[in-house]
């Protein structure tokens, strides 16, 4: 499961398998956060 706040927010939590989806859905900055995908 992934928790996605409004687009442009800094903090983004990724769930297993949702990492790639989160990176695409959120701003590029999200890719720098912890991504256990």
Swiss-Prot record:
Segments of this protein annotated with the region Right arm: 27-37
GO molecular function, one term: structural constituent of egg chorion
Region (Central domain): 1-26
Keyword Metal-binding recorded: no
Record key words, sorted: Repeat
GO biological process, one term: chorion-containing eggshell formation
Cellular component per GO, a single term: egg chorion
Coiled coil residues, start to end: none
Biological function: This protein is one of many from the eggshell of the silk moth.
Family: Belongs to the chorion protein family.
Designated name of the protein: Chorion class CB protein PCH12
Native source species: Antheraea polyphemus
